[in-house]
Amino acid sequence: MRYTAAMTPLTPLQQGSAIFSAIVAAPFGAIGIRTEAGQLRELAYLPPHFSEKDATDALAGQACRQVERYLADADFTFSLALPEVGSAFQQRVWGAIASIPRGSVRTYGQVAKHIGSAPRAVGQACGANWFPLVIPCHRVTAAGGLGGFSNHDDESGFHLSVKRWLLTHEGAALAGTPWQQQAMWA
């Protein structure tokens, strides 16, 4: 049987690239940046087969520059304006997570205790985070190891490798299980 070239719909990869206003290369793959109506809408961790994409607007360009600065220097502080998204509970979780210092990790249980909630609910709020890096959910781990990341089942291990890279980049001690957690929120 012979096949000939024909016009075909966009592949899922091409469709995925099209939704982003910019794509920044990263040591673990790429980071997709989506803007809409003058607001940042999403930062997404993308596998290595995504190609870089120049910013399509000024806000995407600003986000690209800040992501690149963070990737070069873990001490960089983001100044991107984030739209108010999520429930009041999710915002409480994200606020607590934003206070975790670089190079440190906290468990889902520690965050839950701090805000008066349950660890599973904290994990669900982490998975609903549209702005990872800026709201650093990678700094929240399970009591006995990395736990999940970005609400993905992660059979490929990609998202956990991103979490591991981010924590290493920020200087978090990854050796040893269970994790040695620092006291916080007395």
Predicted feature locations:
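Structural motif
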Residues: 30, 39-40, 139
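General helical structural elements
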Residues: 6, 38, 167-168
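Short secondary-structure junctions
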Residues: 12, 52-55, 173
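Beta-strand scaffold of nucleotide-dependent catalytic cores
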Residues: 22, 42-44, 149
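Compact structured core domains
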Residues: 34-79
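DNA-contacting interfaces and partner/effector-binding or oligomerization modules
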Residues: 2-35
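Nucleic acid-binding interface residues in structured DNA/RNA-binding domains
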Residues: 16-19, 27, 76-186
